[in-house]
Amino acid sequence: MLVLTIIPLFMVFIVKSQHLLFGNSIDWFNQHVTLADALRHAIRSEGTIFPTYLSNLMSGVNIYHFSYYGTLRFDVLLGALLIHVKMVNIIIFYQVFLIILTLIACYLFLRNHLKNRYLCFLMSLFTLLSALFFQFHKQIMFVNYMPFLFLMLRSIDRYFISQKITSIVIWGSCIVLHSYFYCVGCFIVCFIYFMLHCYRYKNYKKHFLHLIAAYLLIVLLTAIYTIPTLFVIAGGNKSVNATNYLSLLIPTFSLKGLLYNNYGCGLTYMFWVLIVFGLFKEKTRTLSIILMISMLCPIVSLIMNGFLYARSKILIVFLPLVILQVGLVLENNHFKINKYMLFLFVFPLFFIQRSELVFLDLIISLIILYFSKINKKRCFIYLLVPLFVVYYNNPTTSFLPNKQYKKYANQEVETLIQRNFINTLVNMNEIHQNMNQTYQNQVTRLSGYTSTNHHLYNSFLFDTLKIPISLNNRVGQIDQNNL
């Protein structure tokens, strides 16, 4: 497990050596760094870890409008404790820590199911070389729950030995506090995994009731966070395009939720091949069917997204089950390709972009799988393929340069605020990057960005006052000349 700690540290070191921050150049600073800084100062100013009001953004706003980003995340709480440490450093440290914890939790989870330690290690590396690496420096709340999801799944394994739900409740609560929007999908994944265990037992009703009790305890423990957030979501009344539910029942074979896409699992074609292989083995058939339905049917994405939209980014919560399934199939890799397998291998190629490269990936996958029947260590060669995909999906231009960060942070503005005792600030420089910046809670801003903006206030700004919509949506209000 020491190697699983060193490898992600080495990858982050490579990024740092290029004079880059481990953060994306687009959304990372203006949504995550500045908001976390505002939230930790709200904790300090109210003297409680459960603040209710964010006075320095949007001229004062209910703090639960920002809970989408995780107001009770552990790095925010740590930032409130270490108030003199720059929030950017705390966030980077915490995200790297979560990556390492994810790999270790993945390895420990797989050890419950796989006999081959090398295979557990290999699957943990595949986890690192998925969409996780991209999202851990882009949209943090898409993946920051992942180590706790692996630990919750591992706790389910332990439950069927000890009959205790304590650890399920603990890790489930951590998932909610880090990413309430993705927690529903995580709990659906855990429910699926739990029921796969249950079918072996005659008295499955008792176990089912225990899981319901665990979920209820999670809701009660996090109620101070989840209940106000639900009211905020209801008040937001976010309008979405009319959904054609019948069209969502039609399978789509682009596999965006599984392959190559950063807004999905971001895996490579070997994983689809092995899921198909699992379909033809009794031990792994059920999970393969579940995964194939989830990745092919858009209606699953709609359900996992709380019926808001059918975007495939939510399918990243299936990553632990995909990793487990592929590990199980690889460990018992003794089968011949039949015509049905061949059809399922080839058919998605007609719907995936850059199909010639994907076809090459398919050929490489089949060759490596053939030669790894005897020696599983040969599968390590395939790591070069996802490594190339990660390199392609994470160019240096996607990271925030140190110089650009200093420009966004703008210490001169902070000095100006302190010298002139400025209380309210409109900053027309880098307006898209500083909209959530409160300069250590020294000023009140009219600007702010949150995905759960209140619809009445939103309507007042854009419909009554006729303020120009400067972003590609109505949830952000930036400093403008007419404010």
Predicted regions and their residues:
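Start-transfer (signal-anchor) and selected internal transmembrane alpha helices
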Residues: 1-18, 210, 370-379
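Membrane-interface coil-to-helix junctions
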Residues: 7-103, 126-146, 233-238, 245-264, ...
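Periplasmic/ER-lumenal interhelical loops and adjacent helix-loop junctions
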Residues: 74, 207-316
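Soluble catalytic regions of membrane-associated enzymes that act on cell-envelope
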Residues: 81, 380-483
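Contiguous transmembrane helix-bundle modules in multi-pass membrane proteins
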Residues: 289-296, 304-405
